[in-house]
Amino acid sequence: MGRGTTLEDPSLDLCNGVYLSEKERVERRQVAATKEGSTFAFLSSEVVRYSSVAAAMAAQKELLKVLAQCQSEKGYKDPTGALVPYEFKTLSNIPAGVVSESNRVFVYTNIDSGTRARTLLGFYQFNGDMFTGLYVMNTEGFSDAQVAKWLKVAATMASRLKG
């Protein structure tokens, strides 16, 4: 991925939020995969090291705050003032192996409508000064089996995050 090892691109960008913690990142590796003809609009994993445990905790708090606002407002307003709608779904059957609930933010949401409609699975996991993210966006939504498959991938990423 172009610039996948730089700090130029944001790590946290859910719901177009403001994440001041981005300036506390000291290392980053993001990898994206694409396949022509695939319904996956975006598939990426990322690992970030923050300047401190406190900085990583601040990032998680910012993410939770933006998520709560996006859920309550059912989306966010773009620069023109138009609402970009989000319809959040509940993730069930969280597998063993992911980080504890207090150290993760898992998102399952439909974004926008019409030709811009897409579904996001975002798995944000924190451990100490490290963060790992798995982002899967599909233009055709996800079956329960697909969600379960990506949750297993999140568990694998969590095991690597733990060292």
Give, region by region, the residue ranges found by the protein language model:
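Surface-exposed amphipathic alpha-helical segments
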Residues: 135-163
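Mobile, glycine-rich extracellular loop/lid and propeptide segments
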Residues: 118-127, 137, 147
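Glycine-rich loops and low-complexity Gly/Arg-rich segments
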Residues: 69-74, 131-134, 158-160
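Short, well-ordered beta-strand elements
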Residues: 43-46, 129-139
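Residue-level signal for secondary-structure boundary sites
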Residues: 53-55, 132, 142
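A small/polar (G/S/T-enriched), proline-flanked helix-loop surface module common
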Residues: 1-119, 153
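Short, solvent-exposed coil/turn segments at beta-strand boundaries
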Residues: 99, 124-131
